[in-house]
Amino acid sequence: MTTLSPEAFAGHTPMMQQYLRIKADHPDTLVFYRMGDFYELFFEDAEKAARLLDLTLTQRGASAGTPIKMAGVPHHAVEQYLAKLVKMGESVAICEQIGDPATSKGPVERKVVRVVTPGTLTDAALLSDKNDVYLLAMCTGHNKRGVAVNIGLAWLNLASGALRLAEIESEQLAAALERIRPAEILTPDGATDAIPAGAGASKRVPAWHFDIASGTQRLCDQLDVASLDGFGAHSLTSACGAAGALLLYAAATQGQQLRHVRSLKVENETEYIGLDPATRRNLELTETLRGTESPTLYSLLDTCCTTMGSRLLRHWLHHPPRASVAAQSRQQAIGALLDAPANASLDALRSALRQIADVERITGRLALLSARPRDLSSLRDTFAALPALRERISAIVANADALARVDAALAPPAECLDLLTSAIATEPAAMVRDGGVIARGYDAELDELRDISENCGQFLIDLEARERARTGIANLRVEYNKVHGFYIEVTRGQTDKVPDDYRRRQTLKNAERYITPELKTFEDKALSAQERALARERALYDSVLQALLPFIPECQRVASALAELDLLAAFAERARALDWVAPTFTDEIGIEIEQGRHPVVEAQVEQFIANDCRFGPERKLLLITGPNMGGKSTFMRQTALIALMAYVGSYVPAKSACFGPIDRIFTRIGAADDLAGGRSTFMVEMTEAAAILNDATPQSLVLMDEIGRGTSTFDGLALAWAIARHLLAHNACYTLFATHYFELTQLPAEFPQAANVHLSAVEHGHGIVFLHAVNEGPANQSYGLQVAQLAGVPAPVIRAARKHLAYLEQQSASQHTPQLDLFSAPPAAIDDLECADAPALPDTPHPALEKLRDIDPDDLKPREALDLLYELRTLVRSHDADGHA
């Protein structure tokens, strides 16, 4: 605890001195200071909380001559206020009364029992059911010369106890943070590492917390091992430094040991298919480009029956394994679930899973001794349901190794279940302070105290009947009031019948009130029975929590198995409902998708046109041409999504699909200005293209959509041509290259590994019908004017564009110049077309021609067309009569 100078306390009351000491230890944290039924905030904390939470700011007296500004929240509603503050990135120290007000001399003893921060949430009320919350620490590693060589990362899901380490290059930091999405990031004081905007709440901690030797020892102590060799982490020095700071910070916020952090996973970048931030964003895995949660691949796949399964799905989507072995194991399990006999049907299994509690997070709270009564009853009911759940999958475990592993892990911890069954009431109260949590029969003393409290009325009735019979006083009454407690009342005319063991308690005008040894004994028990029962129940509950701690590893094992079973069952349900198939894998280079469909778009439309996609050693780049809105981007995205789904372990939306090795997926689809970073749309596009050209390998899948926009026509065309050539000649990756530069369709003549495909459309009048079918060969036109018309561009603009298009096509044909890209640069204004190369226009145009130019046949009714025809004939005759040719 920080010690303040005596001068700092001069003039302050004892209570404010206590507060100031506590606040000095948490200078950058809001302190919720418990006073009775409220948590109070003082001084600057009060002003800040009032502003953030819209609380009333009050002022009560002064301390050391300074007005005491106050704001408070009721203790029973504290969680809703904590949730708001954490969402804003704030941290809150919860300071509770731990002393007894009745026996305290001076202020009641208080201390901070926990600190709630964005990255250390465990309370159910503060957590999103389907999102994990990560605390991450980063530590820069240096060589002997002091040169930075890497960045060590350690991140912890405190709610589950999952701890992971990795070491990355500095340029990989943005991608790593996008994948992990930490809620809070710890960095050393004085560090210069640039954390990308929006990556998470940043927290500076003392640099010595990141000491590598101390961190390594702290990690070994946490995992109860002598060395980290068994986890493959012995050489990750900077990551161990980060882990040391992370564990120190997390334990400090909880005010206790992290008993559930018992394992460690080291992540290697070669373990998963690489997905950079642009790819995760463009494929809309868990969030749309508009920032909404639906429609996304995650929202389509998430039919999980438990929140554990939903969280695991999110993790799998962002961590598709490169090795196809994991995917094949999962798909084998899906097949077994789909082929299960009636007694182990998929529907029956999912119905049973809906009754399962969130064992993962309950276990986390149990380890931190913060589990509530209904957490324990839910854990008990889940463990009791495990035998029936295992019975449902027992018939099919032989057909799938993944299911056999899950089945073995679902063996219920018998001793844990016995303790929960005997100790916890069938339907306990929400909070221990409300009573009714410990089951009857678990503790004789508690049962007796409850009996006294619950049977008080009956005891008094029985006592009154016995005393009337014993004394012969017919109007004797046994009663109670708050001032005098229990008493026996006898009217004055009957006092001569009072036995010797009656002791006078109160004299009234017409009666005497007595107490007997038996009634006094009962009174002592009854008056304190409820209070003593609650205290006894609290002590018993705490002892139950302590007794459950040894079962944490078993609870974690069950939670992991339940999440995997639930997710596999959800994959099976999606495959059955949406007519998906199991993909196959090969070690050969290639991708073969027959009648593939975009999983998310298909769910949003009535009819979806399926398309094939084929890559191989002799076919590495597809040049995709066709109209805007024709489906080029959809076709590219669906190819990437089908590949990702296959490696995640799901069935895929296709008639058949086969995949060779894939190490990374890149996308260059669409872009927007990066205003905060000072980058234009074109700069963003080129940055993404550079990453692809530098990092793509022959096993990478690359999506390039209309590269070269945002600059001059010839600059853009030159860049697109050079980029496509480089991808073919040097990267040799699987590439889907959509373009409006029709000059690029000549590329297959130079590179046989390139092929032209196009999205077809049919012109109808001045309109267009998109067929969304992918065909071999290049498109014959872009249909840009028709798309513009569909978009609602005014008719005069469309007519002017048609005139200019005809002129440009005529000019191109006469001069043999390349076709211009109509979508990269706007055409010159019609009024500016009089240039040296333009044909001379007649000084006096024919009036009939002028009239014809202004006509839109699609807008004419039959009668109007006939009248116009007569008008044109009149104009021609009149013009000829004036002597014109």
Swiss-Prot record:
Enumerate the Gene Ontology biological process terms. mismatch repair
Which cellular component terms (GO) are annotated to the entry?
A: cytosol
User: At which positions is ATP bound?
Assistant: 626-633
By its UniProt entry, which Pfam families does this protein fall under? Answer: MutS_I (PF01624), MutS_II (PF05188), MutS_III (PF05192), MutS_IV (PF05190), MutS_V (PF00488)
A molecular function (GO) held by this record is: ATP-dependent DNA damage sensor activity
Instruction: Tell me which PROSITE patterns the record gives.
Output: DNA_MISMATCH_REPAIR_2
Alphabetically sorted, this entry's keywords are: ATP-binding, DNA damage, DNA repair, DNA-binding, Nucleotide-binding
Keyword ATP-binding among UniProt keywords: yes
Matching InterPro entries, A to Z?
DNA_mismatch_repair_MutS, DNA_mismatch_repair_MutS-lik_N, DNA_mismatch_repair_MutS/MSH, DNA_mismatch_repair_MutS_C, DNA_mismatch_repair_MutS_clamp, DNA_mismatch_repair_MutS_core, DNA_mismatch_repair_MutS_N, DNA_mismatch_repair_MutS_sf
Top-rank lineage group of the source organism: Bacteria
Name the NCBIfam families on file: mutS1, PRK05399.1
- Biological role: This protein is involved in the repair of mismatches in DNA. It is possible that it carries out the mismatch recognition step. This protein has a weak ATPase activity.
What's the family?
Belongs to the DNA mismatch repair MutS family.
Q: Which HAMAP family match?
A: MutS
Q: What is this protein called?
A: DNA mismatch repair protein MutS
Provide the gene name from the record.
mutS
